[in-house]
């Protein structure tokens, strides 16, 4: 069977069940019997959101089923499969609403079933602010209780809202795990049709927060794809009904990750096979492009900007790593996503415990990063931040960069349990947090074995540094169309601005034209802004009207005219700094 056959088969099965259930309800209650979910102003929320029509009676529900039938085309195209998935979801909503006839309460603790509008509004704010970075829908039974609980807890620890459908509910109960809206783990129901209650959350969010007009299906699906960061984890075995439900999720922009390998068909970025359940979390976040802010770094000492100015004297030092005396290096490397294992920290060589008190040692750390928007030009920008990151560790001192850095670890930090691996934890968390726009995955390898440090420095790092320098050497002021401003120092010098050109660094000596360009790409509203050079006053002196205007703007009017070439030739008493 093809994927189309499985979706259509599952859709037909659910449609038949729905039709029978509605006919049975009409026979029992009559077609004028009211139907509704409790505590919602949106009638049947999913059907109303998709079609713009409210359903209030069994007669209208029967008519709505006819509308759903029109979505069930059988052309073997992805769009038809997805629409059949939507039809399956709407049928699931019809089956679920029948459970609530006469004000029945079909769900008992721990299951929630339908979620009231008030819950949607309560969840809406943290979803918008990013306090809830995503919504996980876990469907079926995990291979083991331990694996299922570990997956749920991994999402819970990241602040993700977790909804449970099917056997996973019994598994977390067996493990004694607490569930409920207050801990953001919500069991919906054990029937597969209960999955519609989380779909209802997404669609009502579009109506409530997105101002989407009911019935505007195109805008609705764009909103859920762009604004509702949900995804599905479906454990094997997957029957045709679950496959059809998965097609509906994909139509809304929610990727499905499964460990099923039998008779399953991959759809890039939408239907993803991940056989290792322990990797469901990382695969799901990557597929949905969810970035998790790391608020707690697992190290035994404090981490804060208050420690940036901390000096560690030799008498207070446990060990030192000194690039001026032994081989050291710090490097960022851009890799393919398949080459990076997120949050893997590896130490190759001795730990601090194995080093003599007060000794000088080698260290080289390579931070491997991967991301759809990552570029090699960003590497030195990230590297330059290592100084700040490591200096924020209580009891650790860092200075220098590239292959001339020096690090000291204090006796107090060592006694508190600080290890080399904790430098990796800090680098990982800081890079993922600050460069989340371009870094999706990050892995840190720290070498303390002297032979490995020598190899990394001379065979890996220095050739990369040389290539960067050679590239910059080929650029001239005349060969580029734009310069960049740099106002990083305005925190303590409010009218200070540098005009960074290929031939002229910022006066600090740390910001090259390529660095400024990368900084602007990473943070378009940040300290480095594009300065055009389209209206020349005197090209020999490098004088341009638009450069003058930019300098006047960024210096708060303290400087009105600048000629970059005069910085070298001193033909005018102006420089690039005020």
Pin down the residues of each PLM region.
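Acidic, serine/proline-rich low-complexity intrinsically disordered regions
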Residues: 2-386
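Cys/His-rich metal-chelating microdomains
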Residues: 489-495, 511-514
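Short metal-binding segments enriched for Cys and/or His
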Residues: 514-523
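Cysteine-rich micro-motifs
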Residues: 504-510
């Amino acid at each position: 069977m093809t994927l189309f056959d499985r979706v259509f088969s599952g859709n037909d099965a659910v449609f038949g069940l729905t039709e029978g259930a509605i006919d049975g309800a009409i026979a029992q209650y009559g077609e004028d019997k009211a139907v509704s979910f409790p505590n919602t102003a949106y009638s049947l929320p999913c059907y109303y959101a998709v079609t713009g029509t409210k359903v209030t009676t069994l007669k209208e529900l029967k008519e709505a089923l006819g509308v759903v039938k029109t979505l069930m085309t059988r052309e073997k195209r992805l769009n038809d499969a997805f629409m059949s998935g939507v039809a399956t979801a709407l049928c699931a909503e019809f089956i679920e609403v029948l459970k609530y006839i006469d004000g029945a309460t079909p769900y008992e603790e721990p299951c929630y079933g339908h979620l009231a509008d008030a819950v949607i509004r309560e969840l809406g704010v943290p979803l918008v602010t990013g306090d809830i970075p995503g919504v996980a829908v876990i469907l079926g039974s995990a291979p083991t209780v331990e694996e299922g609980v570990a997956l749920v807890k991994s999402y819970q620890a990241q602040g993700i809202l977790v909804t449970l459908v099917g056997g996973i509910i019994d598994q977390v109960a067996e493990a004694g795990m607490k569930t409920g809206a207050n801990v953001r783990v919500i069991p919906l129901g054990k029937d597969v049709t209960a999955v519609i209650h989380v779909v209802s959350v997404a669609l009502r969010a579009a109506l409530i927060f997105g101002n989407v007009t009911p019935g505007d299906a195109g805008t609705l699906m764009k909103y859920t794809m762009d604004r509702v960061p949900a995804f599905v984890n479906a454990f094997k075995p997957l029957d045709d009904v679950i496959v059809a439900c998965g097609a509906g999720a994909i139509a809304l922009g929610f990727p499905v990750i499964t460990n099923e390998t039998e008779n399953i068909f991959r759809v890039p970025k939408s239907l993803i096979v991940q056989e290792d359940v322990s990797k469901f979390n990382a695969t799901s976040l990557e597929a949905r492009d969810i970035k998790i802010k790391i608020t707690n770094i697992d190290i035994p000492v404090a981490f804060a900007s208050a420690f940036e100015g901390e000096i560690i004297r030799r008498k207070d030092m446990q060990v030192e790593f000194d690039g001026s005396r032994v081989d050291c290096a710090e490097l960022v490397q851009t890799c393919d996503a398949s080459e990076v294992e997120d949050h893997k920290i590896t130490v190759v060589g001795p730990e601090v415990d194995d080093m003599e008190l007060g000794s000088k040692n080698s260290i080289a750390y390579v931070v491997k990063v991967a991301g759809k928007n990552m570029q090699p030009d960003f590497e030195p920008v990230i590297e330059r931040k290592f100084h700040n990151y490591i200096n924020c560790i209580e009891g650790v001192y860092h200075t220098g960069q590239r292959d001339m850095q020096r690090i000291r670890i204090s006796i107090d930090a060592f006694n508190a349990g600080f290890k080399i691996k904790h430098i990796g934890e800090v680098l990982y968390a800081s890079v993922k947090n600050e460069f989340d726009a371009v870094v999706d995955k990050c892995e840190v390898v720290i070498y303390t074995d002297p032979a490995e440090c020598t190899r990394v420095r001379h065979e890996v790092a220095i050739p990369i540094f040389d290539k960067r320098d050679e590239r910059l050497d080929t650029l001239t002021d005349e060969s580029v169309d734009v310069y960049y401003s740099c106002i990083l120092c305005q925190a303590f010098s409010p009218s200070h601005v540098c005009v960074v050109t290929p031939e002229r660094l910022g006066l600090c000596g740390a910001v090259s034209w390529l660095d400024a360009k990368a900084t602007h790409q990473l943070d378009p509203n940040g300290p480095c802004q594009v300065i055009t050079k389209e209206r020349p006053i005197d090209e020999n002196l490098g004088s341009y009207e638009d450069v003058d205007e930019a300098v006047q703007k960024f210096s708060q009017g303290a400087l009105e005219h600048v000629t970059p070439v005069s910085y070298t030739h001193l033909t005018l008493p102006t420089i690039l700094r005020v």
